[in-house]
A protein has these predicted regions:
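Multi-pass membrane proteins that catalyze or facilitate reactions on polyprenyl-/lipid-phosphate substrates
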Residues: 1-269
Length: 269
């Protein structure tokens, strides 16, 4: 599968824009690939390369929270006093949330690969639209200490189910946290920290895949850089929209993409 630099950049931009905006990156990658005539299914290394770019974007955007969670975790292992600090709590919430994601993600991998086609994606995008439309604007829990482990578990289960292409991972986890009463500033932070763990796992699992794919370095680097740059800008936009209570703004867009895809598939038959 030879990939041009332009194709790599387009896929990187699509991933960067859609990973953090609540519109489903996996769904958009499937549709971009289909409508641009690059074949129905995407090679897995595309997911891995673009995912590495967005992983770096979150690391840099949320570096204070990442540093707080990592140092808090290691300090908490040796000191009872450190276990009363927000960093320790944040690390535990992210770890608790990551367990169901990993179990569901690995368990459903076969199912997920079968749903990697335009029709199931169109249906899932419409569902994501409803999730965003009915999500609360904010909740009372604005300190890490007020978020419960059950909140983290719920977000982790939702994140695991979001491996279905067309279901937005960021959209559904942020909506789940808002529904559990988490505040509009903290919900996206927790969502993106949960994403970091999963994304890191995907990157590790995918090293062999990239080696085996026999793809030139140029497209791989172009894809990663494009998804990083666009992803960073998209993160800023998501936080701004949530602050203004405009999260549902993406629902009509999702319904439109879904309707267009379904109509197109019906015509092409």
């Amino acid at each position: 599968h030879r990939m041009s630099i332009l194709q790599a950049i387009v896929l990187g931009v699509v991933q960067g824009l859609t990973e953090f905006l609540p519109v489903s990156s996996s769904g958009h990658l499937v549709l971009a690939n289909y409508f641009l005539g690059w074949g129905e299914s995407l090679p897995l290394y595309v997911d891995i390369a673009t995912n590495t770019g967005t992983l770096l974007a979150v690391l840099i955007f949320l570096w204070r929270d990442v540093a707080s969670a990592i140092t808090g975790f290691f300090r908490g292992l040796v000191s009872a006093e450190a276990r009363r600090e927000p960093g320790w709590r944040l690390a535990l919430l992210v770890l608790v949330g990551s367990v169901p994601t990993a179990l569901i993600g690995l368990g459903m991998r076969g199912v997920f690969e079968r749903l990697n086609a335009p029709l199931p994606v169109a249906v899932a995008l419409a569902v994501t639209g409803f999730v965003l439309w009915f999500a609360p604007r904010s909740g009372p829990k604005h300190a890490v200490g007020s978020v419960t482990f059950l909140d983290a578990l719920v977000a982790g289960v939702v994140q695991g189910l979001a491996v279905v292409p067309g279901v937005s991972r960021s959209g559904s986890t942020i909506a789940a946290l808002l529904a559990r009463g988490v505040d509009k500033e903290l919900a996206p932070k927790l969502s993106f920290l949960l994403y970091l763990v999963v994304s890191f796992g995907v990157a590790l699992l995918g090293v062999d895949e990239v080696r085996a794919a026999d793809i030139e370095a140029g497209p791989l680097v172009a894809m990663t850089v494009a998804s990083f740059a666009v992803g960073y800008a998209a993160l800023r936009l998501v936080f701004a929209l949530l602050r203004r209570g405009r999260f549902r703004a993406f629902a009509p867009y999702l319904w439109a993409v879904s309707a267009f895809t379904l109509a197109y598939l019906a015509l092409v038959g």
